Structure formats: C-alpha cells, structure tokens
C-alpha cells in the first residue's frame, strides 16, 4: 500500500453495517484513518474504539447537523434507510435528502470525492422501491460530480447483517422458499468490493462516474444460494419456488396503504 493511502483519512456512513464494519477493519489493517458514522457509535467493539486510527460519530440520514469531516479526504456512503411508509403518504425519500445534506457538508469541508454504494437493482425501469431510491440517489451524486458503485450481491468476509441472516437460514433449513429462483445475479466478494472502493477513494477527479461491479457473466440466484450452502454447510438445499408475479402484485397493491 503506497504512502498516500497510509496518510489517507476516510469517512464511512452506515458504518455498523455488514459492508461498513468489514470496510473499517480493512482500512485499519492498512493504517488508514477512519471516521465512522452510524446511528449508534456506542455499538462499535472496544477493539475498534481503542484503535488510534478510528473515530466513531452519531449519524442519521434525516439529520441536518454538521458532520465531523475535518481533514477527511473522501467519503464512502453506505447508509441506507428502507422506506416503510405507504406509498400514498410517501413524499420525501430520506436517502435522497441524506445525499443532499452529505454533499452540502462536503462543500463546506472541500471534500471532492464521495463514493456512493448502489445496487444492480437500481435502474430506470426497476419495480423495487429500494432500487428506485438507489437510482434517484445515483443520479444526484453523479450530477454533482461524485462516484457511484453499482454492486451485485455482496458475500464473504465477516458475516453480518443480511448476509449473516442468509447463511443462518441456509444452515437451518433444508427447504428454502425463493422468489425468482432463476433471476440473473452478479455476485461480488466483499474483499474485491473493498479494494475497488478504496482505489476509487484516492481519486479526486474521475473520468467515469458509474462503475458496475460483479461477476462478468450472470449466474442464477438459486445456484448462488446452493453453492453457499454447500461451501459452508456441505448440504443440499431444496428450493421451493414462489409465484413472484403474484407476490409482487399483492405487495405492490398493499404498499399503497
């Protein structure tokens, strides 16, 4: 790792997430200073709190308070809030509002580079509310001169959050209900994702603002899950396909109320 990265300071939002905690430890191992922002910085382990390269700060997407970004070179923006309200009463996307506030704070502290972690579910015709929110944030960050990383399903590293729950479900069940079993996905190992985000974090001017990461050729969702079950638990999973279109129609209709 070159001398620039050793002296680099990175801020991470959503820092107590699966990707966030793995990324923090990844940076600290390389002697990169980390300012970690999350809802509850008290939840960080004692080992992290004692590390001289680490600082934790409270943060929510809805907060408009000043962020402790002094001497930060770049920001890895992982924070995301699921929209739980009905679509009838949905007026403001907290993720987009958080993006606006973060960019405003960057201008105050003269930070040139935000790397926003998005998803392959983010595209114009997406049916997912999660994907729609990510897509709107993508456009806002790119329009303001920052970088978007559109990632496939992330796996590997220390199992936390959704990935941990997924592995537990595979371990605990022989029969596994699944929607869109044959859906094409482009998984990426978390170490590869972290290496690329770290590389992008040292750039102040990028010629390309959107990076799509994952396997070059798609694999089916049920194949990916079956390989995880075999790798970690040496077991075969029997998948029970659920009617994806019917479930989508029902949940989409119920989501208005």
What do the predicted segments below correspond to?
Residues 9-30:
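N-terminal Rossmann NAD(P)H-binding glycine-rich loop of SDR-like oxidoreductase domains
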Residues 13, 37, 75-79, 114-120, ...:
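SDR active-site strand-loop-helix element
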Residues 37-42, 61:
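N-terminal Rossmann-fold cofactor-binding loop
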Residues 57-97, 105, 120-124:
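NAD(P)H-binding glycine-rich loop region in Rossmannoid oxidoreductase-like domains
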Residues 94-133, 147:
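Conserved Rossmann-fold NAD(P)-dependent oxidoreductase catalytic core, especially the SDR/UDP-sugar
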Residues 139-157:
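Conserved beta-loop-beta element that borders a ligand/cofactor-binding pocket
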Residues 160-164, 179-201, 208-212:
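Substrate-positioning beta->alpha
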Residues 200-257:
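Mid/C-terminal beta-alpha module of Rossmann-like enzyme folds, strongest
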